[in-house]
Amino acid sequence: MFKYQTILSPLDQFEIRNLFSIDTPLLANMNLSITNIGLYMTIAAFIAFYFSILATNHSKITPNKWSLSQETLYATIHSIVVNQINNKNGQAYFPFMYTLFIFILINNLIGMVPYSFASTSHFILTFSLSFTVVLGATVLGFKEHGLKFFSLFVPAGCPLGLLPLLVLIEFISYLARNVSLGLRLAANILSGHMLLNILSGFTYNIMSSGIIFFILGLLPLAFIIAFSGLELGIAFIQSQVFVVLSCSYIKDALELH
């Protein structure tokens, strides 16, 4: 008799599952469902809202610890937006960029909690964010400059003979922003969680094989703990990188360079 053993894939943790669904005959048999990615994004939105409430200082002179943390994030993102765009236009787009940073950061941090779900590891979410940013920047460019916006694809000092080729390259590069912005975020979160899952399973198998192997497994366990700290840093860095590049795209649309 053959014994079958279930093999767990590191990709199982990223599977989108229906948690609750209901058919609505009154709405053309539309199926309404709540998935794990929708649930965790909703949780992230509530956490962001609750964090803002905790950080409200109620006009007190001495700030609380939540106010200090929010002011630190506020000052950091404000500096990034103003430096990337400019003092005048940066103020207008700062609220959107700050909200975008907090949303991505909280989703990244939720993904670090054991047995939770990493929403930002899914390309459907990150590509939706990147497409929205690039499309918004493109619409903004046409609104500000009209057809002159196409001059963005013409490099300065370009020889006339190379103009068609370089314009094509610049246009493809512009379209690639939609993919690269979302791909960078999802790929970093996805690869980090997969590596942690593989190393954790490997370490568990070693440490559960006996007392000697348990002692030997302390070394990879220490590495996993250190790597988890690195993943926390990546959660912050990738949120910041997404905002920096988004600001850069908006600046290109406003200033055509």
From Swiss-Prot:
One Gene Ontology term of the molecular function aspect: proton-transporting ATP synthase activity, rotational mechanism
Residue stretches spanning the membrane: 34-54, 93-113, 122-142, 149-169, 187-207, 210-230
A GO cellular component annotation in the UniProt record: mitochondrial inner membrane
Keyword match Nucleotide-binding: no
Gene3D superfamilies cross-referenced by the UniProt entry: ATP synthase, F0 complex, subunit A
Subcellular location: Mitochondrion inner membrane
Superkingdom of the organism of origin: Eukaryota
Major subcellular site: mitochondrion
Complex and partners: F-type ATPases have 2 components, CF(1) - the catalytic core - and CF(0) - the membrane proton channel. CF(1) has five subunits: alpha(3), beta(3), gamma(1), delta(1), epsilon(1). CF(0) has three main subunits: a, b and c.
Membrane topology per record: Multi-pass membrane protein
Name used for this protein in its record: ATP synthase subunit a
InterPro entries linked: ATP_synth_F0_asu, ATP_synth_F0_asu_AS, ATP_synth_F0_asu_bact/mt, F0_ATP_A_sf
Function of the protein: Mitochondrial membrane ATP synthase (F(1)F(0) ATP synthase or Complex V) produces ATP from ADP in the presence of a proton gradient across the membrane which is generated by electron transport complexes of the respiratory chain. F-type ATPases consist of two structural domains, F(1) - containing the extramembraneous catalytic core and F(0) - containing the membrane proton channel, linked together by a central stalk and a peripheral stalk. During catalysis, ATP synthesis in the catalytic domain of F(1) is coupled via a rotary mechanism of the central stalk subunits to proton translocation.
